[in-house]
Amino acid sequence: MNNVATAKPEIVMYTSATCTYCVAAKNFLKSKDQEWTEVRIDLDAAAREKMMTLAKRTSVPQIFVGDTHVGGFDDMMALHRAGKLEPLLAGGA
């Protein structure tokens, strides 16, 4: 019997100050009692380059749960509606 608890994966969200979808994504994660690390790409050019390399996208937000690239706000909501986001947030996906 395996008694090792699955650790919740770290959530990293790449954002900018003027992004309304970033605010919506943060509000949604807050409603799910999640914590995340916010990386502001408008303040850090190196972080923007890293996001573009990892996500292969230039828009924000870009959301990562552990090693999984969720995508933007609409992508996260599609996962939620499909019942696949919560297991990912819990570390079970």
Predicted regions and their residues:
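Short secondary-structure boundary/capping segments
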Residues: 2-5, 61, 77
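Local sequence-structure signature of Cys/Sec-based thiol-disulfide redox active-site neighborhoods
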Residues: 2-35
